[in-house]
């Protein structure tokens, strides 16, 4: 049980959330051109403030290095001129996207003459809790403001200096467009209790989105009174069905595992139909090993790979269901499609699941029976991404079925209200 925060910290977090709540009301009334102007002006401000942002980033990286963080962690944390240019470009891309607020998604007329329509509206105040990725500070702020929401941004403590510097540039953009400074606020302390105080403020904050590792997401979900949409780990599978073509099997396995092994839509487990294992596994396994992948395989697949001279280690029980985020891949031979479906139901994380098959019935059954935010048929798991699916920028990939499932773009940062128009009708 956590100790209560100091009265000063609790009061400070309430004031911050109250300012966000006030800003959200102003944003809900803001015209699209004002929001777009704010994002473009923020992009320009990042360019002007590049020197101080990079200096803040260097301080973050130096402190994290002194604390013994890994090279991969430091790479995610660091900003450089090229990455800053990418952050600014992303702001301009969001500004160019259609504004979802006010969109009429359905309309109909009742027999009594009432006209009914559903209209997109902002959620209100969104609390974003994430790890040491300073680019998320700007990405989340941009998507929230564009969709009419105020953002409270809680980065990992290692990214606090750079996030505050980026937020200062973003605030310039808000000011240029006449929008409230509290439309996007970074929590200005590394005290973890600040997060837990904010998570109690369900009277002011409408949604919490944790984005990071299992411990972060579990802590937020367990301690929040605010509704939570989890962006959880991606334990993504590719099932090679009996009819899977060999070259496509190699291509999908390599793309899913090797291109960016640490991202949430990377492949973590390869399932192979037993009737196709002897035909597919030697070549697929060789291609993966040649690309630097360590294979952790079941006894059947280990035997097949060994006969082909492909090195593999015997998988431990907990290798299935694990997000390796590295050049490591679990491999298992399953009896048939039923075996693949059972394995995915047991070990999947509701993120992304894929099948490679030439059998239409198998494809349709896989689509129908697999529960995941995205189901891929004859395509890489890496396509579960807002940009790749044509949705534009995303705040993350939700593995929560409510309120959004899959990539969360602008539309997923809204809800809908009913608007009913009549001419004096009363209910009988």
UniProtKB/Swiss-Prot annotation:
The protein's annotated pathway: Amino-acid biosynthesis; L-proline biosynthesis; L-glutamate 5-semialdehyde from L-glutamate: step 2/2
Chief location of this protein within or outside the cell: cytoplasm
A Pfam family matched in the record: Aldedh
Keyword Oxidoreductase: yes
Reaction(s) this enzyme catalyzes, per UniProt: L-glutamate 5-semialdehyde + phosphate + NADP(+) = L-glutamyl 5-phosphate + NADPH + H(+)
Keyword hit for Cytoplasm: yes
Role, per record: Catalyzes the NADPH-dependent reduction of L-glutamate 5-phosphate into L-glutamate 5-semialdehyde and phosphate. The product spontaneously undergoes cyclization to form 1-pyrroline-5-carboxylate.
Protein name: Gamma-glutamyl phosphate reductase
Originating species: Anaeromyxobacter sp. (strain Fw109-5)
């Amino acid at each position: 049980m956590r100790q209560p925060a100091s009265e000063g910290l609790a009061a400070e977090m309430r004031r911050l959330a109250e300012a966000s709540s006030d800003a959200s009301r102003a944003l809900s009334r803001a015209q699209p051109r004002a929001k777009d102007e704010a994002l473009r002006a923020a992009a320009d401000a990042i360019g002007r403030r590049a020197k101080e942002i990079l200096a803040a980033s260097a301080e973050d990286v130096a402190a994290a290095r002194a604390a013994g963080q890994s090279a991969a962690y430091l790479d995610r944390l660091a900003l450089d001129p090229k990455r800053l240019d990418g952050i600014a470009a992303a702001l301009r891309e969001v500004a160019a996207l259609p504004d979802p607020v006010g969109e009429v998604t359905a309309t109909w007329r009742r027999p009594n003459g009432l006209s009914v329509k559903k209209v997109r509206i902002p959620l209100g105040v969104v609390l974003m809790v994430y790890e040491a990725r300073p680019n998320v500070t700007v990405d989340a702020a941009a998507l929230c403001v564009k969709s009419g929401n105020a953002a409270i941004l809680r980065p990992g403590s290692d990214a606090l200096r750079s996030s505050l510097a980026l937020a200062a540039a973003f605030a310039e953009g808000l000011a240029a467009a006449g929008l409230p400074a509290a439309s996007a606020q970074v929590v200005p302390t590394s005290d973890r209790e600040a997060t837990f105080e904010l998570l109690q403020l369900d009277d002011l904050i409408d949604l919490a989105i944790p984005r990071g590792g299992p411990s972060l997401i579990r802590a937020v979900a367990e301690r929040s009174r605010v509704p939570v949409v989890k962006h959880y780990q991606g334990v993504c599978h590719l099932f090679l069905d009996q009819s899977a073509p060999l070259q496509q099997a190699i291509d999908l396995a390599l793309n899913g595992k090797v291109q960016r092994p640490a991202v949430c839509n990377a492949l973590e487990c390869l399932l192979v139909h037993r009737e196709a294992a002897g035909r597919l596994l030697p070549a697929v396994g060789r291609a993966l090993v040649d690309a630097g992948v360590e294979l952790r395989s079941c006894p059947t697949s280990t035997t097949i790979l060994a006969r082909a001279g492909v090195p593999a280690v015997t998988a431990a029980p907990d290798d299935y269901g694990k997000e390796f985020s590295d050049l490591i891949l679990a491999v298992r031979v399953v009896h048939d499609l039923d075996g693949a479906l059972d394995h995915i139901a047991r070990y999947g994380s509701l993120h992304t699941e894929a099948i490679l098959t030439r059998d239409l019935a198998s494809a349709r059954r896989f689509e129908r029976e697999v529960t995941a935010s995205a189901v891929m048929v004859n395509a890489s798991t890496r396509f579960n991404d807002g940009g790749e699916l044509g949705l534009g920028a995303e705040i993350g990939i939700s593995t929560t079925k409510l309120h959004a499932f899959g990539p969360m773009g602008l539309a997923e940062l809204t809800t809908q209200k009913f608007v009913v128009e009549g001419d004096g009708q009363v209910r009988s």
